[in-house]
Structure formats: C-alpha cells, structure tokens
Amino acid sequence: MLGSRRLRSPALVLLLLRPLLASGDSASRLQTRAMNPGGGERGSPEDSHRLQRSTVPGSDPQRSNELLLLTSREGDSPEQRHHVLYFPGDVQNYHEIMTRHPENYQWENWSLENIATILARRFPNSYIWVIKCSRMHLHKFSCYDNFVKSNMFGAPEHTPDFGAFKHLYMLLVNAFNLTQNGMLFKNRSVWNKDCKASNCESNPSTSNGGQKENERTCEHVDEPSMSFPPLSLDGASFTLIGFSKGCVVLNQLLFELKEAKKDKNIDAFIKSIRTMYWLDGGHSGGSNTWVTYPEVLEEFAQTGITVHTHVTPYQVHDPMRSWIGKEHKKFVQILRDLGMQVTSQIHFAKETPSIENHFRVHEVF
C-alpha cells in the first residue's frame, strides 16, 4: 500500500514536456499539492520541477509521442537501470490544460505531472516515463494511434502486426540516445516555483488533437546544472503500466508478441520486461477490454512476466458494460491456468462506483 510509505520527497527532474507555468492561485495549488496516497494534499512545496516538451520519434518520423521523464535528482546513480513506462487514460493531460478545461478541471489531481510523482514514490530509484497519446479527441478521449488501430474515440482494433512493440522500442532507443548526446538539457525551458508569470510569454502550438493551445515558455531561470547519467538499454529492466484507456497499449503488445519475438532487438526488450500492471482498464468499444484469446495469452505466459490487475467497481461492476467484469475474470483465470504469476485485486468494492475512485486506483495499487 502506497499510503503506508514514508519516503523523502525527491527533487524532481521532468523532461520532454512543454513548459507549463501556472499563474496566481493555480500555481499555488500546484506547488502545495503533495502526492500523499490515501488523501490529503498533493504536490510537495519542497519539490522543484523542471518541465520540457519534446516530441520523440518512434518507429518512423510520422509516428512520434511526447514523453515525460521523471527521476530523483538526489540519490540517483549510474547503476539505476529500472524504468517504469506509464500509459495514461482519458482526460489526463498536462496540469495547466486540465485546469482550463470546462469539465476536466475536476480531475486535475490526476494530471500527467501528478501521476509521475505518484509513480516516483511507488517505484523509488526508478526512472518514470509517461508516454502521452498521440491524439486527444475533443481534448478528452485519449487515442493511441501510434500503438494500435483506433477509431475516432480511441477504441482499439487489435491486430498482430500493427507495430506497437517496434514503436515502443524505438521511442526508448531515441529517447535514450538523446540523453547520451546531452540533448535533453540543451535550450531547456525551466518551470520553477519562483518563476513569475511576468517572466513568461505564450506562444501558439498545435496540440495532439490538432487544435491550438498556448505554450508558455519561461525566460532563463538560474538553476544548478543537472547531473544526469546517460541512459542505456543494456542491462535495463522495465515495468509497464496502463491505466483505463492506456491499457489498450498493453493489450496490443500481447497480440503482437509472437511476431515481435522474431526481431532479436525487440525480443531482447521483451525479455527485459519484468512486470505489467493493468489499472482499471476500459474503453468505449463494446468488447475486448481485456484480452481473452487463449492463443494470445499462451504466448504471453511464455514470457515469465509478472502480471498485476487492479480494478474498481466503476469498470468491472458497470451494469451497462457487463462484459468488462466478465472479460477481466477470464483474463486472470486463463493466465493462472497457464501458470503465470498473477495478482488481481478489486479496490473500493463497498463504495459507490465513481470516476474519483477509478482514478484513486493510482494511490492503492
């Protein structure tokens, strides 16, 4: 349980993200929001954040994603090799964008930045990567078009040859190469709790949804130089996490396993995946929320990856989407029958299903 941890708040380095400067009361709320699982405040005032936006290409120049990297500045060492890859769900976006949305502001506690902080506490001494969807329909529906064939609202159509594994592998290769070349620190914009709105200017940029958003860029802020060891895939290990809509990426990876293993580099990457977490998976399609095809799961069982599923009544007890709970049970049962190491837990079972508890699964998994 994350709520029982008493970890020192890390000094955070956030890279590959558009500069986000909240002003006035909004900035104050962001600075004082501490990620204290189980309730209370979120965002610790002693945390200093550096935020950058960058687009990292994947398997080809037309397939790229924005990445958010978070690592502890104090206590890091070149020996750290574990990486947590997180795929967000619907409505999750950068904090400033969420606070300005007429509906999504309600869930600003679960912005990409805040989730990265939760994961840093959940997985200490690990690099945390948030992989943003390439398209956000109506600024609400996350669409992982680079990983799986999707409809307008991001519901997937799974195939064995879309290239999700290749895209994910190349995203990491290219991002790691940027750290080796020192590119992540060149011409960086810095978001700092002491940076004032007067030091920033708004520039138009095109959002993933094809609509214009304001990109705020801070002027130079004096910061101590960063000591950041170059990242390497050699000897690295990985944990993959999908939340809600983000689980479609994990599902697509399962469909591609058999073919992906034929590539020696991707096969080596697959062998470096230690654990996969499905957090309350769901999407707007009428089926295939969970993978239930025995032949696909048989291939998955051969990997030896540890599986964790954490669900809430919001998804698995929804009477209007009864297939979700049935598919979840079947997914878990088939994997157990195949001898995989699987844990499955339902949270907030005695509480009324709610979107808030759906998001709170981040605090209790």
Swiss-Prot record:
Gene Ontology CC entries for this record: mitochondrial matrix
Segments of this protein annotated with the region Disordered: 28-64
Domain of life: Eukaryota
The organelle targeting sequence, given as a residue range: 1-24
Localization per Swiss-Prot or TrEMBL: Mitochondrion matrix
Organism: Mus musculus
Pfam families for the chain: C2orf69
Keyword Mitochondrion (UniProt): yes
GO BP term (any one): oxidative phosphorylation
Entry protein name: Mitochondrial protein C2orf69 homolog
Keywords: Electron transport, Mitochondrion, Respiratory chain, Transit peptide, Transport
Compositionally biased intervals (Polar residues): 53-64
Keyword Plastid belongs to the record: no
